[in-house]
Amino acid sequence: MPSVLWILFDGGGDRPRGGKTPFYAAFKPTIDYLAALGSCGILDPISPGVRPGSDTAHLALFGYDPYKYYTGRGAFEALGADVSLRPGDVAFRTNLATVDDSGTVIDRRAGRYIAPEEAKAVEEVLSRIGQEIGRKYGVEVIYKSTVEHRGVLVLRGPVSHRVSDTDPHKVGAKLLRSEPLENSKEAALTAEAVNELTRRFSEAAKELEVNKARKMEGRLPINAILLRGGGYMPQIEPIREKYNMRAAAIAGVALIRGVARAVGMDVYTAPGLGGTKDDVFDEAVKLAVELMAKYDLVFLHVKGTDSTSHDGDFDGKVSVVERLDKALAPYLDKLLNNYVVVTSDHATPVAVKEHTGEPVPIMLYGPDVVVDDVSKFSEVTCWRGSLGRIRGINIMPMLGSYLGVTEKFGE
């Protein structure tokens, strides 16, 4: 029985520069070959004009209405970082960042590159501060670093997710105070604990040895923690029950690992797949092809296209696509007997450096898929394809139909 390999270029959609998008400019003979033998179209990850977050977009792509199931990004980050959540826990996505003396954000990612040993040193400081705050407020505070500037913070006890972010979401704005969004003791306590942790980390960061070393190297200090997306674990019907598919995900990013785990996918990683723009894909693609013998659906997440977009790096984005395609090439013969989906979770135009609401290209190859006249995978060409314009939530039912695992609607 055939299975599906689903390749997802995070933030892969883009706007043209000189008439070409990164997908159009990339030399990707394997993906284009599959596109020429399959059906193409354009995809609104959530719905037309909606600017998706990666969390809500992946929920929709996996076949779950984000307006029904989304309870905040933090819970998915925690699951992806292998932090077990209990009922009532509140989790936040965190960024390690750089602020000036006035508390104005200079860089929301502290220069983006944070070495593992630097992240570990910061984790130790935040864990110590968290323990002290926990004793003061009667809660448990858990901080875990994930990839580069990213991390997760979990509060356990009499807490509430109904508090505002401290992340201003843009450079040049001041670090925000968390405020309760409801009139409850739990929300007030949560906001107080978050604000104290934020303040105390910025104070402690002045004496961090890693920051002294970064200053000597001319790099930005890690002197702020930005919190956003406070949420709790949603109740989600497993993908095996909802779509009758055995599904696996390969991802290096905690958020995507968490969303996949929340919907009941088995989660894997691979050497070289760290969730950065410098990822090497050979082992990840090899693992994906091997897992196709065990699963109906194997999802492979590529983060680098989004990272390069946020950095405004057009050529870097092209390079990520080309490296993935090159890693895919040796397995083309095996793929021809199965289904292959290639798409994005949202557009992150290089010129904008942020998620936008336009549709992204999608292609579906399969031995029995109707072939249209599109011969190149890109935003420019896929508009002409036979899939037309679909939504993210349509993908799983479509795949289930091709695999023959869906129930008939009606008689």
Model-derived regions: residue spans:
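Feature captures the catalytic ectodomains and active-site-proximal regions of enzymes
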Residues: 1-411
